[in-house]
Amino acid sequence: MIEFKLQSQCFLHHWNNYPEERGLLFTVNNNASDSYQGAVMKAMGVVAGVSDMVYLHPSGAMLLEFKTPKGRQNDRQVWWQGQVEKAGYRYIIIRSFDDFTALLDR
């Protein structure tokens, strides 16, 4: 499964099964369509490497990165994960639908 399909499957599962939490799991749109848009987004605060989604779970914020089983983080993603964890937040790499549902069951 490719990353965007996994992310979509997980989001829809959460949306449909946890209606009381709607809006607490959301995507971070940090992909510019061209260099001009990229410059505008950077000036507005877009940071390279941020996680794919933010989950404002009742037990605390979690930053979720979706990767295929063989997918690897790039250098900026590794750096950002370190920043997140130093600040005391949870950064979780989701590699399967089962990883995601296990997270919800915590």
Regions found by a protein language model. Give the residues of each.
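Catalytic phosphate/metal-binding cores of nucleic-acid and nucleotide-processing enzymes, i.e., regions
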Residues: M1-R106
